[in-house]
Amino acid sequence: MDISINDCTDISQIKQRFHDLQVESQRTDEKLERLLSDAQPTEKFNSLIKNMAERLVLFVGQIEELKDAFCNTTIVSEEVIERIKSVDREQNRIKECLLFVRQVRDFKECLQDLNRAMHHQQWEKAADLVHRASSTSPAIIEGKFAHAVVPTAEQPLAPMDTLKEITESLHTLFWREFHKAARNQDQKEITRYFKLFPLIGKEKEGLEAYWHFFGGIIASKARATLDEPPTHALFFAQAFTGLVEHVASIIRAHTPLVQKYYKAKNTITVIEKLQGDCDRQGSIIVNTMFDVRRIDNLVSSIASYKYILLHAKLKNRAFVSDQKELERVSLQTLHPILNEMSAIVSKWNISKIFISRLVLRLSQSDGTSNDPSVQDNLICASIFNSSKMELLLKKQLLPSLLQLETYYFRRSIETSLELEEYYTKVSPWMSSIVDDVMYVTKQVFQRAFFTVSSLFFTRFVNESLIPILRNDYYVYLSHNLLTVCNIIKAQFQRLKNANSIPAKQVENYITLVNSASLSKQYLKSIVDGVSSRLEEVFAFAKDQKLVKKSIDNFLQLTVNFENLCKTSFNMYFPIFLLPRIEQCIDDSFDGINYVLSYEDYTKETEHERLVVTRLRSVWDRVLLLEQFTPENQLSLRSMACEKAASYIENLILYKIQWNDYGAMALENDISSLITIFSNDQANLRHSFERLQEILILLVWESDSTAPEQLINDLNLQLLSIDIVSAIMEKKANVQGED
């Protein structure tokens, strides 16, 4: 509490009051200092505002002066603008005049330099100068000023006439030198003068000279080849191959040069002309081949062939050797001709693909086709729409090839049937016709495929190959096999004993069913051999679809052979295998007790059970299938496993008596038997899935006996409610007896 100085009573109070006054004085001084320091920025800010106000007043005054000046000088501004425009026009005229004079001067200098270049025989420089001079506007060259200043004593004609005269002179010179280099086969000089034609505005003439030169080379080489006598079987195929490869090499080597100096559009024109030469020479080669090989006569000869032996074999009639039909054309004669014709078709179609890709690339580089999806869906170039060679192939070569190939294939099958033998000394047993027919099938299929002609391939496969295989080869095999099956079935029904059936009939059956199985495998391997190369061989998207469809149709033949095997197995299995399988299982379970005590169960499980030992020793002998093909063995083993599983199910449900411990022993025994039956092959174990569900149910302990509940609890997929009910009822009866 503060005390007034007048109220102090002693010295200590006076000292305290003095101290308080000093503290208060110090606080007051600090407060004054803060106020002074805050006042300085405020003064500075006020000074700045005052300065800005003075400048703003000055700025407003200047704006008023400018406003008055603009308002009073409107007419003067329009006059100034008009004068400026006038000066600009005069300046532009002067620039145009200077440019005009400069262009005329440059044109005159070009002509003078051109005259000197020609005098010194500097043809590249001369051509370049002509190109520069020709780039000048015709209005300038034909103007009065140019007519007045350009002519000289050395070049007195009008400027345009002088340029035309020099151009024609150079054109004549280049044409002469180009043909001279062509006669001398001087590739360097040919290229030199070929590049100069576009510079003097003679692109068309340059391309014409190029085409005539190389067209002459193509024709002369083709004629030289045909002038030689045909010394070997593939003479005309070799001649045609040489022709298309020669044309392709010319196009491949010179396309970059032509494209560089003549542009892509003109390059396509050159390719069309060279392809036209290839057409003409190729047609000559094909027509000559038809004459020399007498192909039309061959086609006429085979048309009257009746296939008497083949029909007799198909109808299983005896054939008298004296009635053997005279062979019109030998297969040895026909085979090289087919190779020759196919090679020509192949080379032509490969050439079409090459040209089409090149034309597409040139079109894209020229900007006429820039769709990126076009390259993935290549189509044939329009060049071939009017091709003579293409027409000759469609009208003459391919129809003849189709008839000859069809005869070759069917006659080969007829010969195979005539020479048929059964091979039963080595396993698997089979007929000789399988190797013979499938070898020829692969040969003609691949020959048709590699013609690279979707038209020929689809027609041959769909109209000849498939019908002949189905109506001749398949019918022959199926008729013989089903006949043997019916004979065996009839004998079994009469004798009631499979062992009494003649061994010859069984031998015929195994041989024929193996032949059907091998035929299916061969057909698949033939298709696999070409399917991976479909897109590589047939580049056109449309062709790929047609060929793929024909291959799929061909592959459907395998279904016929597969069904034939299944049908024959349905006869063979119940007669020869099923009784042995059932007897084997009965013998294995004979005398085996499954009503066991705990002690009996423990003792029995210490070693392999007798039922397992018995089956292990006889199962391989029961399925003695070594004469069958591996695929047929697998099919029969699969059928055996299915029947074994079904038979054991029946034993469990209706014959074998078991209790709880016996069910456990039974489950162990059958699990071991399944391993023996399936030979540890996973694809055979699936036949026992239903049996394994029954085993699970046998050893399952549950308070619930409702079948539906058990099916849900154990996730039983294959057992019906009736089967589950029967098993649970049998378990209940066993437990009741216990």
Swiss-Prot record:
It is found in: Golgi apparatus membrane. Component of the conserved oligomeric Golgi complex. GO terms for cellular component: cell division site; cell tip; Golgi membrane; Golgi transport complex; nucleus. Keywords: Golgi apparatus, Membrane, Protein transport, Transport. Component of the peripheral membrane COG complex that is involved in intra-Golgi protein trafficking. COG is located at the cis-Golgi, and regulates tethering of retrograde intra-Golgi vesicles and possibly a number of other membrane trafficking events. Belongs to the COG4 family. This is Conserved oligomeric Golgi complex subunit 4. It comes from the Eukaryota. It is a peripheral membrane protein. GO terms for biological process: intracellular protein transport; retrograde transport, vesicle recycling within Golgi. PANTHER family: CONSERVED OLIGOMERIC GOLGI COMPLEX SUBUNIT 4 (PTHR24016:SF0).
